[in-house]
Amino acid sequence: MTARREIEAITARIAERSKPARQAYLERVEAAISAGPHRTVLSCGNLAHGFAACAPSDKAALAADRVPNLGIVTAYNDMLSAHQPFETFPALIREAAREAGGVAQVAGGVPAMCDGVTQGMPGMELSLFSRDVIAMAAAVGLSHNMFDAAVFLGVCDKIVPGLLIAALTFGHLPAVFIPAGPMTSGLPNDEKARIRQLYAEGKIGRAELLEAESRSYHGPGTCTFYGTANSNQMLMEIMGLHTPGASFVNPNTPLREALTKEAAKRALAITALGNEFTPVGRMFDERSVVNGVVGLHATGGSTNHTIHLIAMAAAAGISLTWQDISDLSDIVPLLARVYPNGLADVNHFHAAGGMGFLIRELIDAGYLHEDVRTVWGEGLRPYAIEPRLAPDGTVARPPALEKSGDDKVLTTAARPFQPTGGLKVLTGNLGRAIVKTSAVKPEKRIVEAPALVFHSQEELNAAFKAGLLDRDFVAVVRFQGPKANGMPELHRLTTVLGVLQDRGRKVALVTDGRMSGASGKVPAAIHVTPEALDGGTIARIEDGDVIRLDAEAGTLEVLVDDATLAARPAAAPDLSANGFGMGRELFAGFRALAARADMGAAVFG
């Protein structure tokens, strides 16, 4: 089925805008492909170093250059619950490779930080830039020229975008992404949020809060709310970089093991040594990008991807803009309600029909490009399935459920939860910003109130504890952009502002920083660009200025005349403390080079 005319028009616009960069990118990919399997250009000394530690049979196969070699790029560490399962994946992948007549080696490891651990801490100021570090670290591993394809083991917030940037940089190689899956359900997410608010109000102590948090985050796998990590998995599947049905199967299950081994075998099957050569640089095009944005809107996904998708697309020579994202939001309906956009978690979403149901609905309604190439082959329709374990231990894929298993969690395109997507671009005299509307009640989407200005989230939290915020206001938290301090997430403010909203106050947030993908019920204009340190109007706001945030109309304005604003000096706080501690001193160059949020906030030229 062909995509709707409006979807086709936006895709064509992206393709036309991207022509020079995309052509240059594809020329580089084709030049690398024409060189053939890269082990053939290695000297005997190079090659001997490359397989010195391999098993004798693998060494013999690689020496003869007769089998494909699969590079494993892993983001394993055992502090991240989502990445702990990856400890055993290389052994599974090696076993699968041998069964398929190939070899697999760990090409390299990349860092993986947990935003849940660093939230509200100095380390959070490294979070966004870790994406580009991950891309560079993966590139180092793949630069040995030993591999015919690569698999990428990653799940969480910056890890998957960084890995995809690296994969596209090595676009002459096939690339398959392998997830670990979500942890089993624990304390319901709405109950966790309620307990956090009680703690913020001083009604319970740290012991009670820690007990609740530990019941929420209790085992291996991805956090179960629909934040950036699970948005990543949705994107990889809907853009055809996972094998069908791989995203949301729990870790340490026979089905997850079968999916992992199958992904390794599939990566080997699509190398230049076989008959289905699928280099990721050819495969991933503007249709793939649009499918990703459509999936993001249809599920109410993470605001972080209004930054990451732009950076990922750019790695393939594709120019995606906030306007494209906004225009698609006006077209694509919301089909999923997963916390913070609802009460269910991703396990409930998967049980209700999951990615297969969602993809089928979006294809049949004309919102997705079906005519794409994926790691599985031609077309996206094979992803409209439900993964199951077959009696022989392999993966079976019957068609997706005809009806949603729970229409409060997952619905049809004919009966959407709302007619438009979950993300919107705001414009006005404060610049441009992003707001996530899918978790905000319609009556809370317009706020007009005096500004209270803060230069850190700690300042706002201190004002709350001092009892100074029990009123209507718009919190302006500035100097949180990429150039100022690395654009940290300000997710801790959600609890404080949520308490005030529950007391009946009209509250909103305006910031040049980010919010977590889990951010919810309080309207928040985030990623304000230009940022305060880059000459943005947000640097000229003063306490008492009336700000109007209208998430319905898509506007963000300070109600002060232009002449008055222009005459004001920009605030210039001392930001020297941002440059030291927890490794921040090593990232001064990143802060200096970072692009604007609406350009992907990348440090690469």
Which residue ranges define each predicted feature?
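Catalytic or ion-coupling anion/metal-binding cores of large enzyme and transporter domains
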Residues: 1-68, 74-78, 82, 91-108, ...
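Acidic/charged coordination and interface sites in well-structured regions
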Residues: 88
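N-terminal small/polar loop signature for handling phosphorylated ligands or for N-terminal nucleophile
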Residues: 107-145
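N-terminal glycine-rich "phosphate-gripper" loop used for MgATP/nucleotide binding
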Residues: 131, 153-156, 353
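Contiguous domain-boundary segments centered on the initiation and propagation of an alpha-helix
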Residues: 131-138, 143-150, 461-472, 476
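Mid-sequence acidic-hydrophobic segments that form the walls
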Residues: 137-145, 153, 166, 219, ...
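A short, small-residue-rich loop immediately preceding and capping a beta-strand
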Residues: 141-163, 176-178
